[in-house]
Amino acid sequence: MKWYVLQVMTGSERDVCTALRRKGVKARAPDQRMEIRRRGQWQTEDRLLLPGYVFVGAEYTAALFHVVSPVPGVIRWLGLEHGEPQALDTREALRWRLDSDETLEPSRVLFHADGTWHVLDGPLAAFAGCPVRMERRQRRAYVTAELGGVARRVRFGVIPV
C-alpha cells in the first residue's frame, strides 16, 4: 500500500476522512497533542498536524481517483504529474507516523544554558535533518519539511525538560 496526499479545504479534514472511510478508502489526518497557554494556564489540546492535508493509503487506480475526487472538501491530489499522483516513500510515511491512528504526543526537548537544544524523543526526532526553529516560551517547534515535493512549515508541540 502506498500513501498519497490530498489537499483539502482547511477545517474539513476530519469530514473528508470520515467520507473516505465510508467509501472504503483508508484516510488519515494526523493529530498532535499540544500545550497552549490561555488566561495564564497551560491547557492540553489536540490539533491537526497538517491543516489542509489528508493522507490516503491505497494503490492508485483511475477508480480510486473517481471515488476520492468528488468528496466534498477535496481540492486536489498533491504531486499529480502525468495523470498519476506521486506516492510518499516508506521513509516519509513513517516520518509522518501514518502507520498508527494515535494522537502524537509532544516531543521532549532538552534545552541547554548556551541556547542549544537536543530532541530526546517524540515525532520531532524523525525530522533531524530538516531546518528547525524552536520557540521555548511558546513550547513550539517549526520544521520545514517536504510534502508532495513542496517545502511546508509544520508546527510541533514540545515539552521542555
Predicted segments, located by residue:
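Short beta-strand-centered aromatic/proline hotspots
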Residues: 125-134
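Short glycine/proline-centered loop/turn elements that form peptide/ligand docking sites
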Residues: 113, 123-125
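Acidic-enriched and Gly/Ser
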Residues: 1-118, 133-138, 142-161
